Amino acid sequence: RGVFAAKRGVPRLLNLFKRYGIQTTWGVTGHSVESFPNIFEKIVDDGHEIGIHGYSHENPLAMTSNQEADVLDKTIDVISKFTGKRPVGHMAPWWELSPNTIALLRERGIKYDSSLMEDDYHPYWLRDGDSWTKIDYSQDAKTWMKPWIPGKEVELIELPASWWLDDAPPTMFVKSFPNSHGWVTGRSLGEIWQDQFDWVYRNHSYAIFLCTIHPDSAGKPHVLM
């Protein structure tokens, strides 16, 4: 899947964007940049923004704070050397943030994240330090029946992601993922996205409409069409 994405999916999407004059942001892994430098050079040459997306698509929730910091530092270094400037955007692998992610991003000068879904069509300031009590069925119920406590807003903007504006769940087949599909047509996906866009256009005077596509799914002919 990864080799197809780099060798076939990326060039096809770049041709599509060039044909319609679309400028995009690519969340890329450091591993992909180092493995396929000639492919990713074309993304930069076409004027698209490069954001960080882990080194090997590591889940932040599965890492220690030191591991997460090392992954961020390595990926930022790879992209900075490749593009000639430090990335300012972050798209978390799996769209998961650990309790340490926000602080680590701010320490490294990241200006925005695009992984969370507290809103759907409007940017918002992220908070650091949200807390809630997890359910532990081995304990008395009173131990977890406590409200969520919001943390403090920080200077890190969230451009909200959305599973309903993501091509992967409906168009990408992955054997180990119970919710993967892969047999939804591009026309069906376009209809869902068009309905959302029409609703936003009618109900908001200001909004962002952030679509997420992947070269290993959107780069397939039946989706491109």
Question: How would you label these PLM feature ranges?
Answer:
Residues 2-7, 25-37, 58-69, 91-100, ...:
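Acidic-and-aromatic substrate-binding clefts and catalytic sites of carbohydrate-active enzymes
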Residues 1-49, 210, 225:
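Active-site beta->alpha N-cap acidic-glycine motif
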Residues 204-225:
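Extended, basic/helix-rich recognition subdomains
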Residues 10-14, 37-41, 69-76, 102, ...:
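Generic structural signal for well-ordered alpha-helices
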Residues 80-81, 85-205:
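Active-site-adjacent pocket scaffolds in enzyme catalytic domains
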Residues 17, 50-53, 90, 105, ...:
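Conserved, mostly hydrophobic/aromatic
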